[in-house]
Curated annotation (Swiss-Prot):
GO terms for biological process: mitochondrial translation. Disulfide bonds join C45-C76, C55-C66. It is found in: Mitochondrion; Nucleus. Residues 86-105 are annotated as: Disordered. One of its GO terms (cellular component) is mitochondrial inner membrane. A motif (Cx9C motif 1) lies at residues 45-55. A motif (Cx9C motif 2) lies at residues 66-76. This is Small ribosomal subunit protein mS37. Residues 89-99 have a biased composition (Polar residues). It holds the Pfam family CHCH. Its main location: mitochondrion. Keywords: Disulfide bond, Mitochondrion, Nucleus, Ribonucleoprotein, Ribosomal protein. Belongs to the mitochondrion-specific ribosomal protein mS37 family. The lineage of its organism: Eukaryota, Metazoa, Chordata, Craniata, Vertebrata.
């Protein structure tokens, strides 16, 4: 396809008030948001788990030889579980950084947007 000429490109910039593309839907915000699932986040304790499995492999899967690595992994997983509990408590109390999609939809329905263009 041929490249647009310089005159054609300059003609678009000459009239800044007129949009270049015509939207297929009106540019109005909706009164609800999509109900999507939250991201699960990254996996925790990967390093401890890999150290534990490497120890098992070296010691032919004997728990007695890898007692320290197993304990480190269990400690890390319990800390991660406590952090998840605290985060869920903060979200339920409304102290989280962002609102859930359900709460956002409730707020948008309480304070709806104008449904016509100004």
């Amino acid at each position: 396809m041929a490249t647009p000429s310089l005159r054609g490109r300059l003609a678009r910039f000459a009239n800044p008030g007129k949009p270049i593309l015509k939207p297929n839907k009106p540019l109005i915000l909706a009164n609800r948001v999509g109900n999507r699932r939250r991201e699960k986040g990254e996996a925790t304790c990967i390093t401890e788990m890999s150290m534990m499995m490497a120890c098992w492999k070296q010691n032919e899967f004997r728990d007695e030889a890898c007692r320290k690595e197993i304990q480190d992994f269990f400690d890390c997983s319990s800390r991660a579980q406590e952090a998840r509990k605290m985060r869920s408590i903060q979200e339920s109390l409304g102290q989280s950084e962002s609102l859930s999609p359900h709460k956002m939809t409730k707020l948008l329905q309480r304070f709806p947007n104008k449904s016509h263009l100004i």
